[in-house]
Amino acid sequence: SASSAGGNRCVAAAEACTADAQCRQLRTEYVARCLVGAAPGDCVRSRCRRALRRFFARGPAALTHPLLFCSCADPACAERRRQTFVPACAFASPGRAPPSCLAPLERCERSPLCRPRLLAFQAACAPAPGSGNSCPQDRGRLCLHAYARLVGTAVTPNYVDNASARVAPWCDCGASGNRHEECEAFRGLFIRNSCL
């Protein structure tokens, strides 16, 4: 309800999902898979990611996408949004430095599950020729759908902090050596994407 959400669109999106039996069941499943043990390192990332893929594949997009893309005006809302998909299990490795972005990219390119999703994301989210950095009107929804399909893959993206709406896989380009430009190009698909 709007009153209990207090203007927080992420809370409103969670409440809407909870009110729908299918969305609630799929959300309960991924939360159970991703929070097993609740201690760092206790989760089985492959099971967590599989449950997240099921959530987006089987849940109604009208309910799943608002959880992923809710807009926030304050850090508390942004942190809730960042935590929605249990990043400690699905996204990052707590206590460890992020790997070079080339590592998850290479895993994705070898994966029959991830590769077509990444290619679809690249096609749907690339700026149109001559449009500069702006997102063409007809691509916005396609890009968001393709982005949602990456959640639960080797290149699972998430919000990078609670101070912005920037998204990226859990990685950086500091240790990419002579492939730094390739690494930054991949990371830029997320952090410099005007369609997201």
Regions found by a protein language model. Give the residues of each.
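Mature extracellular/luminal domains of secreted and GPI-anchored eukaryotic proteins, especially small
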Residues: S1-L196
